A protein has these predicted regions:
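Conserved ABC transporter NBD signature motif
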Residues: 58-69, 74
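Conserved ABC ATPase signature
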Residues: 131-135
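Conserved catalytic motifs of ABC-family nucleotide-binding domains
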Residues: 152
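ABC transporter nucleotide-binding domain
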Residues: 175-270
Length: 328
């Protein structure tokens, strides 16, 4: 059974087409990721699925309920952890969770038992009676998630759950999400612009770009669909000739999806070991000193580039102001 179904969703904010025919489904008990740069439409999709925004057209079902026709039913089925926390920072972690339970009609011993279970599960039992303002960034996000689980939802939406966390706190959060998926028997839909996060956590991934889903599947299948290897050549001083270096590599037989990231020229080739001598020789012949060269199997970054023709990191940076303006 599908826990989430999105069919041809469209949403426009003034001149910005946020969703342009988004369709996908999430199986019951699955961890599913919407992966894309800032401004791609991920958060708008989640806002539609959580009844916070009505689509201009299309249909969405969560737990078998239509989000537009029966929003109250949907709200009882879901937990939602937004990018911006809804925690009362002057209350304790426990008080925040108790309030959430009461909002959902819970009370007495069952509510207190549930809160205690979740505090233990997310590693906040020892900090439960501290004012939330004093929590670290990672603790605050774990409290957000615990609050979203108080009423035992069937589906949990995590919108950019690790944004703003340092790498160590992000890794801890990944472990927590994996544990929650197992112990709570949840369907989880998470949005992220971290490639490694989607690769680590999701059973299936939908890559979102400019309001559309361009491809979806398991991370392994998506990467396996790209033949060959990625070659990265870091250049030394180039005297402003980076575009010329890209052109040099583009002319080589077998070099595909050649692009520039800073001073690094990246390309996809059938065989890295065979391609590297040709690339180095061509660059040397045009006076480009090379600092380093590496090869790697295809990544989700390569998948994004292949299906969109755009570099993930560059587009993520380019659309940060747009995301702040309309997607959140």
């Amino acid at each position: 059974m599908d826990a989430i179904v999105a069919e041809d969703l469209h949403k426009r904010y003034k001149t910005v087409l946020a969703l342009d025919g988004v369709s996908f489904s999430v199986r019951d008990g699955e961890v599913f990721a919407l992966l894309g740069p800032n401004g791609a439409g991920k958060s708008t999709t989640v806002r539609v699925l959580t009844t916070l925004t009505r689509p201009d057209s299309g249909r969405a079902l969560v737990g078998g309920e239509d989000v537009a026709r029966h929003p109250n039913r949907v709200r009882h089925l879901i937990g939602y952890v937004a990018q911006d926390s809804g925690v009362d920072w002057e209350a304790t972690g426990r008080e925040n969770m108790l309030l959430q339970g009461r909002i959902h009609g819970m009370a007495g011993a069952p509510l207190h038992k549930r809160v205690d279970e979740l505090l233990e599960l997310v590693g906040l039992a020892d900090s439960a009676d501290r004012v939330a303002r004093g929590y670290s960034g990672g603790m605050k996000r774990r409290l957000d998630i615990a609050i979203g689980l108080v009423h035992k939802p069937r589906v949990l939406f995590l919108d950019e759950p690790t944004t703003g966390l340092d790498p160590e706190a992000r890794a801890v959060m990944w472990v927590e999400v994996e544990r929650l998926a197992r112990q709570e028997s949840l369907t989880i839909l998470l949005t992220t612009h971290y490639l490694e996060e989607a690769d680590r956590l999701a059973e299936r991934v939908a890559i979102v770009s400019r309001g559309r889903i361009v491809v979806q599947g398991t991370p392994e299948d998506l990467k396996a669909g790209l033949r060959g290897e990625s070659v990265s050549v870091e250049l030394r001083e180039t005297d402003g000739r980076l575009a010329e270096a890209v052109q040099v590599v583009q002319k080589l037989d077998g070099a595909d999806e050649v692009h520039l990231e800073g001073k690094i020229v990246r390309a996809r080739v059938p065989n890295g070991a065979q391609a590297i001598p040709m690339i180095l020789s061509a660059l040397d012949g045009r006076g480009f000193p090379v600092a380093s060269v590496t090869t790697a199997r295809p990544s989700l970054d390569d998948v994004y580039l292949h299906y969109t023709g755009r570099d993930f990191a560059a587009e993520d940076e380019e659309h940060k102001p747009v995301a702040k303006a309309w997607e959140r």
